[in-house]
Each structure stands twice: as structure tokens, then as C-alpha cells.
Amino acid sequence: RKIVNIEAETMVDMARRQILPAVEKFSSKLAQDIAVKKSIAPVVSGIYETTLVTRLSDLVEDIDAAVEDLAAALATFHKIDDVTESANMVRDVLLPKMAALRAPCDEAEQRTAEGCWPFPTYGDLLFGVE
């Protein structure tokens, strides 16, 4: 119970304070780049960038909704005193909501430029240890 609570609280905090701002900053920069390219060369389609900005915006919405959903579930979880009831809530509610938050965050990581992502990549962790 305690470990899942810490993990869920950490997910909420990381998403709110680091992931959402990083994705927003990257997508805003990308949108500015599209505008600059089109002002210089109006024939530039910017399809890739426009599609990416749109998808990142959708992911921001998904992440935000999942964060709020998980935070609300945590608020309910904190009010439960019964061990069996809290264990059932972990299994039936918290873990699925944590997975629901992780999915759009993982996709956002894949679509956000490495230098803009606030955490080391899996490759950095696997091969960067000396």
C-alpha cells in the first residue's frame, strides 16, 4: 500500500511539474518554428511539424486528464482505513490509473526531442552508467 502510494504520488508530481511543462515547451517551440518557416517560405507545407504539434497537444490533454484522474483516486485512497478495501483499491483503481497515465507519457517521450525531455532516456540509463 505504502509503495504504490509513493509511486502514484510521484507520478502525479512528475507529470505536473516536469512532463507537461516539457511537452508544452517543445510543442510551442515547434509551432513557432512552423510559423517562421512559413513566413520565410510560404510553400513549405510543415506537415510533419503540424502533425507532431497536434499529436503533442492531444497527448498533453490526455496526460492532464489522467493526472487529475489519478490525483482524485489518491485523495479517495487516503481516506480508506480498511486494509482489504485499500488493497482492492490499489489493484482495481490505482494501478490501472497509473498505467493510464504512463501510456501517454511514454508516447510523449518518444515524440519530444531528447534535449527537451526532463529525464534521462532508457538508453542513457542502460549505457550511460560508468
Model-derived regions, located:
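C-terminal amphipathic alpha-helical interaction region
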Residues: 1-130
